[in-house]
């Protein structure tokens, strides 16, 4: 977008476009809505070269998807955030095979007796390439990239092994596992618990 136009004009145009594209339309008996995201860059403020402007617009589009908003204006630093997300998504593909994941248990204590009754399973990732990657960073990207199913499968398998080990030791403790919305909506979810 040319920087001689006002940001107010652009904001109004984007809102008009959003209103138009967000209006449901019919095909046969079904209503449909278009999903879209817009990345905003300014010439020359965000770059003078076409390739750079296009890349920054694409980065802004990806950021708008992450923020679940229909448009994001490019800001300094988005390139680095975008590259970090790509590295995480790429590294996640091998995290299970490379044995970079581990479980951490948050104890559950009976307040009346003070006895241990179980634990909540928390997933942690120590990447050889990226170092420690927090679950607040990698889980949303796993959901977006489709890698969450493999992570959930791994967590369930490892949790089952832990429960089996406790059972063999005569312990009757419970484990709680956090599931993603993606997992809850999956037809494969019941298969995890067979």
Question: Could you tell me what each predicted segment is?
Answer:
Residues 1-86, 90:
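Cyclic-dinucleotide signaling modules
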Residues 23, 41, 106-108, 124, ...:
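Output-coupling edge of small sensory domains
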Residues 84-141, 178:
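Active-site core of bacterial EAL-family cyclic-dinucleotide phosphodiesterase domains
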């Amino acid at each position: 977008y040319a920087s001689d136009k006002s940001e107010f004009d652009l904001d109004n145009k984007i809102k008009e476009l959003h209103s138009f594209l967000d209006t449901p339309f019919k095909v046969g008996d079904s209503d449909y809505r278009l999903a879209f995201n817009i990345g905003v860059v300014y010439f020359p403020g965000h770059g003078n070269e076409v390739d750079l402007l296009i890349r920054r617009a694409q980065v802004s589009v990806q950021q708008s998807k992450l923020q679940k908003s229909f448009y994001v204006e490019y800001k300094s630093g988005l390139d680095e955030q975008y590259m970090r997300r790509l590295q995480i998504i790429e590294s996640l593909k091998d995290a299970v095979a490379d044995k970079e994941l581990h479980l951490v248990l948050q104890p559950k204590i009976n307040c009346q007796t003070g006895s241990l009754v179980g634990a909540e399973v928390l997933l942690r990732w120590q990447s050889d390439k990226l170092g420690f990657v927090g679950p607040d960073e990698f889980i949303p990207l796993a959901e977006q990239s489709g890698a969450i199913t493999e992570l959930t499968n791994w967590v369930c398998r490892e949790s089952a092994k832990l429960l089996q080990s406790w059972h063999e030791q005569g312990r009757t403790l419970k484990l709680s596992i956090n599931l993603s919305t993606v997992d809850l909506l999956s037809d494969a979810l019941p298969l995890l618990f067979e």
